[in-house]
Curated annotation (Swiss-Prot):
Entry EC no(s): 1.8.4.11
Source domain of life: Bacteria
PANTHER family: PEPTIDE METHIONINE SULFOXIDE REDUCTASE, PEPTIDE METHIONINE SULFOXIDE REDUCTASE MSRA 2
Keyword annotations: Oxidoreductase
Alphabetized Gene3D superfamilies for the sequence: Peptide methionine sulphoxide reductase MsrA
UniProt function note: Has an important function as a repair enzyme for proteins that have been inactivated by oxidation. Catalyzes the reversible oxidation-reduction of methionine sulfoxide in proteins to methionine.
GO terms under biological process: protein modification process
Residue ranges of coiled coil: none
SUPFAM superfamilies linked: Peptide methionine sulfoxide reductase
Annotated organism of origin: Listeria innocua serovar 6a (strain ATCC BAA-680 / CLIP 11262)
Protein name: Peptide methionine sulfoxide reductase MsrA
Length: 177
């Protein structure tokens, strides 16, 4: 994997703590950074983003090798971490800072995301329409260090949150099997 061959992908799917591990454990992923994007405040803090005044959403920025793990596969992994029918947040986390968004970095990513969204919507997997936003990637601001790799640093807290938030049960009911 050379630096020249790497690309970026950015996904928002509720609490960013829960969005790192599913990507971080895939082949061809160089790094996954938790952060904020899509808003108007420069270098926002976690507290500011949670206040709902910045316009940002919690997201992960993934640096990946498309020859090893193509963008299409990243989008598949993304869908399986989210409730794509809920535009007002994800699971217990509500509000714009937790809204589901696929942020595309180029036209190819936009087309892949749009096609994948349409296919998921047409699949009949969900009774409600797929409402995940697809938007142009903007400046990404890394979150504070204590948020990075949370699933590794705070394993028990992370696993408890996955269950308590309702995310784990939703994934089991809608994406497994």
């Amino acid at each position: 994997m050379t630096k020249e061959s790497l690309e970026k992908a950015t996904f928002a799917g509720g609490c960013f703590w829960c969005m790192v591990k599913p990507f971080d454990t895939q082949p061809g992923i160089e790094k996954v950074v938790s952060g904020y994007t899509g808003g108007h405040t420069v270098n926002p803090t976690y507290k500011e983003v949670c206040s709902g005044t910045t316009g940002h959403t919690e997201a992960v920025e993934i640096t990946f090798d498309p020859a090893v793990f193509p963008y299409e596969k990243l989008v598949e992994v993304y869908w399986q971490q989210t409730d794509p029918t809920d535009a007002a947040g994800q699971f217990v986390d509500r509000g714009d800072s937790y809204r589901p968004v696929i942020f595309y970095h180029n036209e190819e990513q936009r087309q892949i995301a749009e096609k994948s969204k349409a296919a998921l919507d047409a699949s009949g997997r969900f009774k409600k329409p797929v409402v995940t936003e697809i938007a142009k990637a903007e400046t990404f601001y890394p979150a504070e260090e204590y948020h990075q790799d949370f699933y590794k640093k705070e394993k028990a807290h992370y696993e408890g949150y996955q269950v308590a938030s309702g995310r784990a049960a939703f994934i089991d009911a809608n994406w497994k099997g």
